[in-house]
Amino acid sequence: MPEKKKLQLGLSFAPNAVSNLEQIEDYITENGNSDLATKVVDKILDRCEDLTVMPKSGKPREDIAHGLRSVTSGMYVIYYRIHSDKIEILRIWHGARDNAALIGEI
């Protein structure tokens, strides 16, 4: 049987998501482990890239905003939307943060 080709969507990061990644890296680095900071950010970016092949792998988060989905990467939650041509990463927050704070920000 022929192998199915997986369609791959583009990937974009909203300014807030870029800022979130920078804050995560800075926080871990400031607490003494720049190698760990790099590994955590790389793992988050890998998970974001996975979404371009499996966009619906995340959990629908209609409780926060229409069309919003989320996946986890370690202790972090990646919030995103699926568009016709790309995955848009909107926020990347520590899992302990209050989701209610997202309402109105996405």
Task: Give residue spans per PLM region.
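Enriched for short, Lys/Arg-rich terminal
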Residues: 76, 81-106
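Alpha-helical transmembrane segments and membrane-interface helix-loop junctions
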Residues: 13, 25-26, 38-40, 46, ...
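Basic/aromatic recognition patch in beta-strand/loop cores that engages polyanionic ligands
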Residues: 46, 56-86
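Arg/Lys-rich, positively charged N-terminal/basic patches that mediate binding to nucleic acids
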Residues: 1-39
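Residues at alpha-helix boundaries and the short loops/turns that link adjacent helices
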Residues: 31-34, 51, 96
